[in-house]
Curated annotation (Swiss-Prot):
It comes from Corynebacterium glutamicum (strain R). Residues 465-485 are annotated as: Disordered. The keyword Nucleotidyltransferase applies. Gene3D superfamilies: Hexapeptide repeat proteins, Spore Coat Polysaccharide Biosynthesis Protein SpsA, Chain A. This is Bifunctional protein GlmU. In the N-terminal section; belongs to the N-acetylglucosamine-1-phosphate uridyltransferase family.
Amino acid sequence: MSASDFSSAVVVLAAGAGTRMKSDLQKTLHSIGGRSLISHSLHAAAGLNPEHIVAVIGHGRDQVGPAVAQVAEELDREVLIAIQEEQNGTGHAVQCAMDQLDGFEGTIIVTNGDVPLLTDHTLSALLDAHVEVPTAVTVLTMRLDDPTGYGRIVRNEEGEVTAIVEQKDASAEIQAIDEVNSGVFAFDAAILRSALAELKSDNAQGELYLTDVLGIARGEGHPVRAHTATDARELAGVNDRVQLAEAGAELNRRTVIAAMRGGATIVDPATTWIDVEVSIGRDVIIHPGTQLKGETVIGDRVEVGPDTTLTNMTINEGASVVRTHGFDSTIGENATVGPFTYIRPGTTLGPEGKLGGFVETKKATIGRGSKVPHLTYVGDATIGEESNIGASSVFVNYDGENKHHTTIGSHVRTGSDTMFIAPVTVGDGAYSGAGTVIKDDVPPGALAVSGGRQRNIEGWVQKKRPGTAAAQAAEAAQNVHNQEG
């Protein structure tokens, strides 16, 4: 039988102040890999498919409560909330959680909201170990080369846990033990409920310790065992910004490795950052300095980077995106983007289309094979198929109060430095001359031009800027011209 065959509940402790973060944001709301710390913990808990998940919140609960609700919506399952009004220790926090688990009988796993690397696989292994042999408590432990600062796991000859001894209370013999407490436990619900009622705060901190449940259970003749995690890095807690960065780097390392094993080439893993929700296809090439964030989807045979940041983007098969910042938009098959392109939300570039250097788009739909090659702003616009927008063109969409839409047809050719004063429509097959300001609709197949004829005022520089280098150059050129004439 596996963990999924047994009744379980998961309690996630997230009530602490997290003062070492030195932040106005509650500790578990800091993010790595595109998720908050508590989101990582809740996703791991949900991976067990337990009957109940309870999040215990307290400090900063006005921030944490809505965040938990959002994660519950993403998971499409209920996450119960327990409030710890005063942070009176881990035992007290679990007491608060038990109010939400009234009548539950089964296994209760207690984990923390600041262990973002902990996986559902490890929690499942803990649950399996707990139910394999009837046990009151199973401690998830880890072995460390340097266990300094951690509570040591003391076992008897049968391998049962007899004590968890904190560093300050440990003898030299016990300090030599490399197996330590991770702070994650599996409990028999009935035994936990009974032991919690017996907790005392007669300790240096004046708090109720969850670890005291182990002694109470053993005192009543119940077995306490341990399950050792295969990867201690999963159980690293985050208490300050340094540990946040370390956890983020380790999570990213794992995510990048998974992408490479899935068929992507990542040229420089050290400078490539990929959020956990990102999807990457096969035969993808990712160049240095690339960040793939949010729910970005990278199709097969896409090339990304270098120096590219994509957030909630969909890049379809065969496209190329170089030195680009893009948000909440879609790039079609075999399209090309960049370099130095800024794609704002609501952009759709069709298959085989192009957004070139120093192009910015926003709420723009650009059809199959259409190109915006250089130095252009396209906002609130629709461009048909196989059209070409000349360099340095601007879609003038804002009148100071409202945004307006521009529609460009298919097979349109516009000259450089064309201004489209929205709302305006350019029909299929139309052209515009360089420097044209289009204020009125252009019929299909028409050539739009604007502005008066060029007028040259002879001698203006010598008259208005006498003695300047420009005036001297002009006079010299005129003398040469007169001599040749």
